[in-house]
Amino acid sequence: MAELSISPDEIRDALKDFVQSYEPGKASTTEVGYVLDAGDGIAHVQGLPGVMANELITFADGTLGLAQNLEESEIGVIVLGEFAGIEEGMEVRRTGEVLSVPVGDGYLGRVVDPLGNPIDGQGEIATEGRRALELQAPGVMQRKSVHEPMQTGIKAIDAMIPIGRGQRQLIIGDRQTGKTAIAIDTIINQKANWESGDTNKQVRCIYVAIGQKGSTIASVKGALEEAGAMEYTTIVASPASDPAGFKYLAPYTGSAIGQHWMYGGKHVLIIFDDLSKQAEAYRAVSLLLRRPPGREAYPGDVFYLHSRLLERCAKLSDELGAGSMTGLPIIETKANDVSAYIPTNVISITDGQIFLQSDLFNANQRPAVDVGISVSRVGGDAQVKSIKKVSGTLKLELAQYRSLEAFAIFASDLDAASRRQLARGARLTELLKQPQYSPFPIEEQVVSIWAGTKGKLDEVPVEDILRFERELLDHLHRNTEVLSQLKEKNVLTDDIVDAMDKAVDQFKLEFQTGEGKPLASVGSEKFEPAKAEDVNQEQIVKGKR
């Protein structure tokens, strides 16, 4: 029998080779957890002691989840996908990554889900990187005051409730009052700026649909395509059929895509349609995660849900590229109750609100903007000088008209000044009507509102106002340089006012009413033209007892 010999040199060399060939990166540990229970898009997981808040985790079937509640013995997880296959005891692993979405210009013209995946059947999207959903909003020193206009193309808004780039302007009203229509009109109105090729004018648009019907989202996409606006628009869709977790995340996905452009020095318009449904989805998620409910069963941090989202809309300082993201959140009220929990929260966060009234909508006043209680707190500094000059008294005149109109119902005999004021107000109200998907360029708005406030329409029958406006603008396009000068200068000079005055007076001589009569004869039959000092003065009449 051969004698077993052990050579210390061989052992030393073997150990040395092993140590030299050791690669620490190949040896790793993985935290593994198990599903305790799952249902309604929520799973409770045991294990994973090192998991981070908002970290992505993977289930054994490949489905992703988002860690939310980090408790002592378990984790509450939002399932990001189909949750029917997730069962008790299923293995769960960490990814070490927080939730993020791909970003870049490849998203323009596309429809994506809340995870950034394309759902329009047009293939993969070329991305420029990824951006975390939960990023801090710009700080105070990173911002600049709002000073550039964001024109909607809607006369009532651009004249009396102006919006600036970087502003958060709430659109609030009951269902079926035209909230989405205002948002879509604003997107369509950016087409001229996009086609100009000037990066300082171009606005990239994001429409976030939260809990909408699939047919509604399809009709919005169709309207944008028909208007040629889809090429600079991204739609983030989380329809009503999606789990509550997706509806909760959709606005953050849209803002992450927009922030990428904003920090790149570009201008962005983002529409959240609507945040009421996001709050309801967050309430459902929170209750399923067993968080303590508060007022109306919403969790205690529902204010923070919207404030951290809307604070991302900003006008950045010149040092950061001077980009901007303008937010138009939409809130749906019930029976015009703006004092409910979510509406008051969002009103306090935003820089102004546009109230839409169902009574005005049903009275065929569309867009149904209630100018008396709508306000823009910062947009006045961004308003174009020409429209600011002609619309200075418009809001006051309409408010006086409303109060006088209510009084006139009970008055059997009104003095001449009150009758003239009622006539002027009726024409101004008619002038602010506008068809859907037909935004007005700012120079056309200036001419229309100038004609209304200066009494140029006082002789025109109310039923002919919109036709008069349409034909007047066509006449100015064909026969004068007024509109091109207004577009170029954006200032109402004395020469432009004189040219407008002459052009409008000339057109009135040619215009015929719907009855085929010359305008001059109709005006003299009905009432005398109103004097500015009479119309601008509100009269109060006291009856003797």
UniProtKB/Swiss-Prot annotation:
A GO cellular component annotation in the UniProt record: plasma membrane
GO MF annotation terms: ADP binding; ATP binding; proton-transporting ATP synthase activity, rotational mechanism
Localization per record: Cell membrane
Keywords: ATP synthesis, ATP-binding, Cell membrane, CF(1), Hydrogen ion transport, Ion transport, Membrane, Nucleotide-binding, Translocase, Transport
Class of the enzyme per the UniProt entry, highest EC level: translocase
Residues noted as binding ATP in the record, renumbered to the chain: G173, D174, R175, Q176, T177, G178, K179, T180
Taxonomy, superkingdom: Bacteria
Site location (Required for activity): S374
Chief place of localization: membrane
Catalytic activity: ATP + H2O + 4 H(+)(in) = ADP + phosphate + 5 H(+)(out)
InterPro entries: ATP_synth_asu-like_sf (IPR023366), ATP_synth_asu_C (IPR000793), ATP_synth_asu_C_sf (IPR038376), ATP_synth_F1_a_nt-bd_dom (IPR033732), ATP_synth_F1_asu (IPR005294), ATPase_a/bsu_AS (IPR020003), ATPase_F1/V1/A1_a/bsu_N (IPR004100), ATPase_F1/V1/A1_a/bsu_N_sf (IPR036121)
One Pfam family from the record: ATP-synt_ab_C
Topology in the lipid bilayer: Peripheral membrane protein
Enzyme Commission number(s) of this protein: 7.1.2.2
Role this protein plays: Produces ATP from ADP in the presence of a proton gradient across the membrane. The alpha chain is a regulatory subunit.
Family: Belongs to the ATPase alpha/beta chains family.
Subunit record text: F-type ATPases have 2 components, CF(1) - the catalytic core - and CF(0) - the membrane proton channel. CF(1) has five subunits: alpha(3), beta(3), gamma(1), delta(1), epsilon(1). CF(0) has three main subunits: a(1), b(2) and c(9-12). The alpha and beta chains form an alternating ring which encloses part of the gamma chain. CF(1) is attached to CF(0) by a central stalk formed by the gamma and epsilon chains, while a peripheral stalk is formed by the delta and b chains.
Full protein name: ATP synthase subunit alpha
Gene assigned in the entry: atpA
